[in-house]
Amino acid sequence: MRRRLWLGLAWLLLARAPDAAGTPSASRGPRSYPHLEGDVRWRRLFSSTHFFLRVDPGGRVQGTRWRHGQDSILEIRSVHVGVVVIKAVSSGFYVAMNRRGRLYGSRLYTVDCRFRERIEENGHNTYASQRWRRRGQPMFLALDRRGGPRPGGRTRRYHLSAHFLPVLVS
């Protein structure tokens, strides 16, 4: 028993040595997360402003209070770690953001369609444009209190209009 205790103590001391693995001075190998790429989820995104995100057949991005609408079913596809593409299943449009922070539906997949997905402390998700920033600040996907798309340049991570809950499609 004593021998095990001494071996455990010696292991702890050696693990804290300057060249031991796990310390900042040790070199790390490249990280690989292939299991997180290519994930596809069908969800409805419910905003903190009480609207479901939808893309209508004309490509207009907006909110709806009707929870059973077919145009609010979204395919959220992971393209890289933390980067997703949002596509409306019924209309086939991708949710995209232009350089001015305006949301629109795009028939083609472009770099404007990529969003950084982050799970916030309150359990909601935020989606920031991967390509566009305004004055160094990320531009977020958001719905205002009337269900309209809020300009990305006027949204921040802490705004409730940018917080979404992914709801399972039943």
Curated annotation (Swiss-Prot):
Gene name tied to this protein: FGF22
Function: Plays a role in the fasting response, glucose homeostasis, lipolysis and lipogenesis. Can stimulate cell proliferation (in vitro). May be involved in hair development.
Pfam families: FGF (PF00167)
Subcellular localization: Secreted
Source organism, top-level taxon: Eukaryota
Cellular component GO terms, alphabetical: cell surface; cytoplasm; extracellular region; extracellular space; extrinsic component of postsynaptic density membrane; GABA-ergic synapse; glutamatergic synapse; Golgi apparatus
SUPFAM superfamilies: Cytokine
Subunit organization: Interacts with FGFR1 and FGFR2. Interacts with FGFBP1.
Lineage, highest ranks first: Eukaryota, Metazoa, Chordata, Craniata, Vertebrata
Principal subcellular localisation of the protein: secreted
Signal peptide span: 1-22
Gene3D superfamilies named among the record's database cross-references: 2.80.10.50
Similarity comment: Belongs to the heparin-binding growth factors family.
Protein name as catalogued: Fibroblast growth factor 22
Keywords from the UniProt entry: Growth factor, Secreted, Signal
GO biological process terms on file: cell differentiation; fibroblast growth factor receptor signaling pathway; neurogenesis; positive regulation of cell population proliferation; positive regulation of MAPK cascade; regulation of cell migration; regulation of synapse maturation; trans-synaptic signaling
UniProt KW Signal keyword: yes
Any GO MF annotation of the entry: growth factor activity
InterPro entries: Fibroblast_GF_fam (IPR002209), IL1/FGF (IPR008996)
